[in-house]
Swiss-Prot record:
Observed effect of gene inactivation: Increased susceptibility to P.syringae infection.
Main location: cytoplasm
Underlying gene: CYP19-1
Function: PPIases accelerate the folding of proteins. It catalyzes the cis-trans isomerization of proline imidic peptide bonds in oligopeptides. Involved in reactive oxygen species production in response to pathogen infection.
Lineage: Eukaryota, Viridiplantae, Streptophyta, Embryophyta, Tracheophyta
Location of the PPIase cyclophilin-type domain: 8-171
Name used for this protein in its record: Peptidyl-prolyl cis-trans isomerase CYP19-1
Sequence similarity: Belongs to the cyclophilin-type PPIase family.
Species of origin: Arabidopsis thaliana
Record flagged with keyword Translocase: no
């Protein structure tokens, strides 16, 4: 059986290095969703339909709500209205096998059923009310402290007090 891929984000907060987040992607249970995220970490698919690189590098976490989650992945508009998957625009909810069990869970942000693109969130708490609505496709395996530091610049509205940017990203294994 193939091992699940591991990818990383090297984060900056307010222009200063904040450390690395390493995530395991559940290719075993959500292969399509995991592959989308993996390829967006490496940037290997080139330019998307919207004329922007299909790559998380340089994009921000535009919505951070303490005691809830940190959301990013909108590399086209940067504000939560955009994003694009490697499959075109949006793709289906693959399954809801994995649950939002606690801090470090990686899940797809969406605008309703079957509207997955490139936006994702990392939970900072158990968020079981999202089970069956958002596809869980990975987990943080190193750098949860970095997620906690990002959480500190969030607010109840989701606006961050300092820019939170994926300065670099890619695949480890």
């Amino acid at each position: 059986m193939a091992t699940n891929p591991k990818v990383y984000f090297d984060m900056t907060v307010g222009g200063k290095s904040a450390g690395r987040i390493v995530m395991e992607l559940y290719a075993d249970t959500t292969p399509e969703t995991a592959e989308n995220f993996r390829a967006l970490c490496t940037g290997e698919r080139g330019i998307g339909k919207q004329g922007k690189p299909l790559h998380y590098k340089g994009s921000s976490f535009h919505r951070v709500i303490p005691k809830f989650m940190c959301q990013g992945g909108d590399f086209t508009a940067g504000n939560g209205t955009g994003g694009e998957s490697i499959y075109g625009s949006k793709f289906k909810d693959e399954n809801f096998i994995k649950k939002h069990t606690g801090p470090g869970i990686l899940s797809m942000a969406n605008a309703g059923a079957n509207t997955n693109g490139s936006q994702f969130f990392i939970c900072t708490e158990k968020t079981s009310w999202l089970d069956g609505k958002h596809v869980v496709f990975g987990q943080v395996v190193e750098g949860l402290n970095v997620v906690r530091d990002i959480e500190k610049v969030g607010s109840d509205s989701g606006r961050t007090s300092k820019p939170v940017v994926i300065a670099d990203c890619g695949q480890i294994s």
